[in-house]
Structures are given as structure tokens and as C-alpha cells.
Amino acid sequence: LNKNLFDVSVVAVSSKEKLVRSADLLNTTFNDNLLAIARAGAGVNNIPLDRCSEQGIVVFNTPGANANAVAELVIGALVSGSRNVPDAVQWAQGLKGSATLAKDVEKGKKQFVGPELRGKTIGVIGLGAIGARVANAAVALGMEVLGYDPYISIDAAWSLSRSVQHCVTLGDMLPRCDYLTIHVPYLPSTKNTINAQTLAMCKDGVRVLNFARGELVDNFALLDALGTGKVAQ
């Protein structure tokens, strides 16, 4: 990709490419022929904005372009994770060829039941295009939904179900959550939003979903919380 940057006028940066070359883009010397960089998504933390501004390179993103696709994945993970579907599938595959298959299934299936979502509480951090969709879907599943977003737009607010409860601070939200999902861009101010301090506020056994940016979660704090049972595995 870096070699091609010297020969094109527009660079389209997809999420897949970001995973394999974000550092390269931040440190790349752009040719004078480069006019614009388009980010397929909302976050632009993988693009050197100051340098692009100095060189007159237009940078634009496409927030919400894949919002529905991501929201569906979040809901899928919410259901499958809570009901232990991945573990159950792996276990079932291990029964292949068993002479006592029906008996084995009947005996072992209860270990994968997992909690139902209806009546449980989910906290949604960030109520933009993706977070709002996740919140509304969770309402439809019969969950109690708490929302936290100090920068929520008017359009996003109008799109939310009336059933979504507004939390002024994370301290108001976290102690009540059985599930927690985060949907904010990566900025210096949002780095490690989920950390040892915020996890300590949560219920024991909280389930955490992050389909936004890895940098939003302190991995060491998360590993510790998984080890103690503060966060469900």
C-alpha cells in the first residue's frame, strides 16, 4: 500500500487495511499528487491529520456507513455470548461419532444454558449511529437499557427509543449493568475508557462487548477482571 501512495490521487482506507497498516499510514510521506484520503468508517486516528492539513490533503470519513452491519454483529455477539453458543458448538463438535450421542447431549447441554437477555440491564456507552441502533435493539429484546453519551447529537437523541434511560455519568450506569457495550471513537480522551477503576464499579460477572476500537479498553485491567470473575468469560 505504501508504494502505491506515491502514484495515486486518492487513497481509500478501509477498516481491513487499517488493521494491517495503521502505523505505516501515520508515518508515511505523501506525494504532492495526493489530494484526499477517505476513511471507510468514523475513526480517523490512523491518519496524520495535522500533516495532511499542512499539505492541503483533504481528509474525510463516512460515519454511520456501516452502522447497521456493526449493530447486527453486536446483537449477535450479545445473544451468542450470553447463551454460551460458541462454547456449546465446540462441545457439540467433540461429540461427533459418539455411540451415546443422545445421552451425552441430554446430560451435558445444561452447562451451556446461560442467562436470558429479557429483564437484564445493558449499558450502552456512546449513542451515535451504532450505539443508538444497539440500544433500540436491546429494548426490543426486553432489556432495560441505560445510555451514556455526553456528546449525543440531536438526530441520535431523536432516533432513540423512549425506553432508553439517560445516565449522566458512568458512575450512574456501571453498577447497574449486567452487560456493557461501548461505541465511541478512539481519541486521547476515550483511551482506556474501560479500565480498572470503571470495571471496579461494575457488577460481578458483567459481560463486556467492544466492537469499536481496541484502545478503548485497558487489556491488562480486563485480563485481571476476567481472572477474578468481575467480568464473565
Per-range role (PLM):
Residues 127-128:
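Glycine-rich Rossmann-fold phosphate-binding loop(s) that bind the pyrophosphate
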Residues 137-138, 202:
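Aromatic pocket-lining residues of Rossmann-like dinucleotide-binding sites
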